[in-house]
């Protein structure tokens, strides 16, 4: 039985536990969270999953992680590298592998090359693997088009569009897309990075790095989507003229004349939600997932399904460009 820990019991953490309850060969040893309303309670009390009735939520991460060695931690706490690096180091010092959903870790070398190098070196020193993952970033707008590229003889452009209906999503997500703000409030908060999606820039850069493309020009914009009619969700009421979502774009030009264009709409009552990959080249093809991949459920599943492989992986930080994937290349 492989020892398993959960670090962060938010909504995705609960879905991870539900997913884990159906798996064999792993044993949940501990759950870590700082929420006083959860600390001291059994996982069963919080999730209703009877299989984990003997596991309790604890605040002291070091105490929990010391219970067993040579395990894996599914890490679900923050979007930003600077917020999680100390948590990673503690986990590695305690002798565990890491599966993390921290969005910036999709390509930590983009904004935090020094910290990324430290994480990689620490993992190698401790002889453990750390795998960043998720559905977006981590799959829908980066890993999936990278793998899709392997069937192309030539590529001129990679274009990915994800349109996500946020009306039924959790409160933090509806808040982070600016629901109910005025356009000027949205602009101010986006400039401070207090709202918006984290990881689209990383998706673009990791596509370029994996395909060995040199970035010539990189542009990222995020505009508000304005409600045309009254919208009501479980958490927000948005009147016409106010913000109901984000229109987020990344445009990359490369020295190899292969353009990468990513577009993400996350909005309340978004019409025709879908994930679409267009690759122009030889041949030119379109891959579409009607309805789109469900964000929270898919993130939980992809994290859990990494457990099977992480114990076989060499030590170090395994970003997408280091995985042994077949993909398009123009030069080696």
Regions found by a protein language model. Give the residues of each.
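Rossmann-fold NAD(P)-binding glycine/threonine-rich loop
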Residues: 102-128
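Conserved active-site and cofactor/substrate-binding residues in soluble primary-metabolism enzymes
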Residues: 7, 11, 15, 68, ...
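Gly/Ser/Thr-rich loops at beta-strand to alpha-helix junctions
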Residues: 10-12, 80-81, 105-109, 135-141, ...
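Alpha-helical support elements that line or immediately flank enzyme active sites
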Residues: 139-150
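C-terminal helical cap and adjacent loop that interface with cofactors, partners, or active-site loops
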Residues: 268-332
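Active-site-lining helix/loop region of Rossmann-like oxidoreductase modules
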Residues: 7, 149-275, 293, 300, ...
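N-terminal glycine-/serine-/threonine-rich beta1-alpha1-beta2 phosphate-ribose binding loop
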Residues: 1-93
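A short hydrophobic/small-residue beta-strand
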Residues: 97-99
């Amino acid at each position: 039985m492989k020892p398993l820990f959960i670090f962060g019991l938010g909504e995705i953490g609960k879905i991870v536990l539900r997913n884990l309850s159906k798996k064999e060969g792993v044993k949940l040893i501990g759950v870590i969270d700082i929420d006083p309303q959860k600390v001291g309670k059994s996982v069963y009390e919080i999730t209703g999953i009877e299989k984990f009735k003997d596991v309790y939520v604890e605040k002291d991460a070091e105490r929990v992680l010391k219970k067993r060695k040579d395990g894996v931690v599914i890490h679900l706490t923050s979007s930003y590298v600077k917020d999680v690096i100390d948590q990673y180091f503690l986990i590695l010092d305690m002798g565990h592998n890491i599966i993390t959903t921290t969005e910036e870790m999709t390509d930590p070398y983009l904004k935090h090359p020094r910290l990324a190098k430290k994480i990689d070196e620490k993992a190698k020193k401790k002889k453990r693997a750390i795998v960043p993952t998720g559905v977006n970033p981590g799959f829908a707008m980066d890993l999936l088009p990278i793998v899709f590229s392997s069937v192309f003889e030539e590529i001129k452009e990679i274009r990915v569009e994800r349109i996500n209906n946020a009306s039924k999503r959790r409160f933090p997500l509806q808040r982070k897309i600016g629901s109910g703000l005025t356009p000027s409030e949205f602009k101010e908060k986006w400039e401070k990075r207090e709202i918006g999606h984290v990881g689209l820039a990383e998706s673009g850069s990791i596509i370029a790095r994996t395909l060995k493309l040199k970035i010539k020009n990189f542009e990222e914009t995020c505009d508000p989507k304005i409600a045309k009619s009254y919208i009501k969700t479980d958490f927000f009421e948005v009147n016409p003229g106010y913000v109901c979502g984000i229109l987020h774009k990344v445009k990359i030009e490369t020295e190899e004349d292969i353009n990468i264009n990513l577009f993400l709409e996350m909005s309340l009552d978004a019409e025709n939600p879908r994930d679409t990959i267009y690759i122009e080249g030889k041949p030119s093809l379109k891959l579409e997932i009607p309805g789109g991949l469900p964000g929270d459920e898919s993130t939980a599943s992809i994290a859990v399904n990494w457990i099977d492989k992480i114990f076989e992986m060499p030590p170090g930080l395994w970003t997408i460009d280091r995985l042994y994937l077949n993909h398009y290349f123009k030069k080696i």
